[in-house]
Amino acid sequence: MSSDFELNNSDFEEDRYSRLRLIPWWDQDRLKNATIMVVGAGAIGNELIKNLTLLGIGRILIYDMDAIESTNLTRSILYRARDVGRYKAEVAAERAMEINPDVKAKAFIANIIDDVGLGVFRRMNAVLGGLDNREARLAINQSCYKVNRPWIDGAIEALNGFARVFVPGQGACYECTMTEMDWRLINKRKSCALLTHEQMSEGKIPTTPTSSSVIAGIQVQEMLKLLHADRKLPTLAGKGYVFNGLTHDSYVVEYQRKDDCMSHDTYEKIIEKPWSARATSLREMLAEIRGELGEKAVLDFDRDIATTAKCSCGENKALFTPVHKLKGEMLTCPKCGAQMTFDSVHSIAGDEDFLDKTPMEIGIPLLHIVGGRIGMDTTYYEFTSDEAEVFENL
């Protein structure tokens, strides 16, 4: 009987990955050369990182802003009692490299919504989510689609959970699945779709290590199939796997793609520039794109930047932060205590009084991608000089 996959002598050599290589379609070198982002290092995130590490994924980027609490210890295989108070991402990265020295893992204490450049997503083979809120999921979805990268979402509640796969150009994306209620909750900055109001207000998240291991296992298994895309393996692209741990029922749902979904915007052409978000000024960037596109070109951002807060009493103060990051105290007048209004921009036309600032000084992250627009045509430019800093030690 013939097979589409052939084994050679190296497939039978005994090493760390020898049993994996016995799978006919398995290519360990792909895993070794893969770069995967894990967003969230809680219950699901721990299982994702553990699985990626055991499989020998070459580079793992771990994003989480939270510190370890004692309640994490019942659901997180990578954490110990002595780790309480430390950042989850840092401990998870350390443990991953202890488990498998072949793996390089790096922690990022960063907000996935505002602090991660699109060029980082662009360098991923896949993004895996272990998140507890819609807003972060939507941000990941939009970032992945802009740079044409797949991502796999996971969520759990008590004994139940689901895993969903979103691949640009293959069925629905995360935003396609969102309801009017989802949008209302995002606007209210509510957490997790699976939580009751009382649980959210009390900060109690009903999760178990058993359900997290099931869902994370499905997520990583789907990632493996995406990494072996040329093997024509069936995936859950545009679909969700739903698991009921109480009855052990499970089923697959297919989501309806919305043709007018705003998240389907993909950057067709991205030009790598020797720019740095830390060192290259907005003035320099604007001058360079005008040299390429024409004198009327403007520099476009994918976010609104709050520039100045203003009070009716005459007091002004500089902000230079994404509007998403604005908090009440930032808009309280230091002089009279009144609520201030603010000005914002999402593009640079050349007449601004802050052109000598760098992107980072106005809230644009390392290795990001910005647009150079003239008329209705946009060309996209990446701050490629930041790659060395972001991927240092990886």
Identify the function of each model-found stretch:
Residues 171-210:
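The feature captures the short pre-catalytic strand/loop hairpin that immediately precedes
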Residues 85-138:
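A structured beta-alpha segment of the ubiquitous adenosine-cofactor-binding alpha/beta core
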Residues 4-5, 57-100:
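Glycine-rich phosphate-binding loop and adjoining beta1-alpha1-beta2 segment
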Residues 1-37, 70, 323-329, 343-394:
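N-terminal charged helix/coil linker that caps or initiates catalytic domains
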Residues 126-166:
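ADP-ribose/adenylate-binding Rossmann-like module
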Residues 44:
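Hydrophobic/small residue at the entry helix of a nucleotide-binding pocket
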Residues 126, 196-237:
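Conserved anion/nucleotide-ligand pocket segment
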